[in-house]
């Protein structure tokens, strides 16, 4: 049964095996935290590459890695199916050079716009570090598979809230017609919107057609907000690149967890795991918590899982040789067949637990007494270096994530996952009335 779950301790002479057990546990926990934090596609991919490199540096069998990938392939398909029908919005990105937010003004005959920069990402602390500039943004579609440039869709533009905008501008006497104050003609405002050049990059999709734009005009006493949004004519079967990436994004999280857990359990013996957990939970001793009991329980549980799964495979083979069919039949037939597996497994689990308890008792194990260790674990410069580098990486990634750094110039689909670009566009489209 070549599954990652049955990977026991694999003795090898590598620096990963020689790391202090507490160091390995701390590094594992830091990366687990990073996996659960929404750090984005790029940073998560870096962790995935790191986990893969560590796996092979530890000289673990390649079949463990392949079985890990096979085990979550079904999960990826399930997530893809769910995202297919729940994420039909491909996301969008409006370029700075081609689109401007506007303040309406009247030049005597026509209603025009003052040009105001739509998309200014220089507010980001890391704009210079990652070279966020307009020139690169306008060329984004040429270097990035994730975008496609739409045709001009001004003929399909919808404008909502235009009546309230006209009423507000007229009531404040903001504009003059031929030297005199008059009411604002909403048709001129509408015409100015429709004449305004709008271009947008959409995430790629299959089965949906781009229909145009919606300009939503929100009016208050002090501000008038113009929000430009694309809208699509999508069918129930539209598949967006965003759905594929989101499915892969979540699946990658689980795969990273599997690889890291495999490295931890395959490079640490039961004694090392118990020692590392006990040292890691040492502060709880101040609260009179039996840390050594918890540590031994966790270590034994980790080691019991592989043995139980091996036993389950043996039972399946034995029952199949007796003519029991676990593969054919409807759902209820298969459930009844599984009873012949569950009952022996429970019996074996209790038997193994009893044998282990007797063996520990015969060796004089007493959880209430202080225990010594045969092997002395010491933290050397390798452990310190590995822990410091991991901690620095952890701090940098969290800091960049909090600041909202993304990698548009690298052609990544970061904006599909975080939505930060979309939020920034909508914020930039909010302008005060003249």
UniProtKB/Swiss-Prot annotation:
Annotated GO CC locations: plasma membrane
UniProt-annotated location(s): Cell membrane
Bilayer disposition of the protein: Multi-pass membrane protein
Keywords, comma-separated and alphabetical: Cell membrane, Membrane, Transmembrane, Transmembrane helix
Sequence intervals crossing the membrane: 27-47, 64-84, 244-264, 289-309, 387-407
Signal peptide annotation: none
InterPro entries reported in the protein's UniProt record: ABC/ECF_trnsptr_transmembrane
Family of the protein in this entry: Belongs to the CbiQ family.
PANTHER family found in the cross-reference section: PROTEIN ABCI12, CHLOROPLASTIC
Protein name: Uncharacterized protein MG181 homolog
Species in which this protein is naturally found: Mycoplasma pneumoniae (strain ATCC 29342 / M129 / Subtype 1)
Taxon lineage: Bacteria, Bacillati, Mycoplasmatota, Mycoplasmoidales, Mycoplasmoidaceae
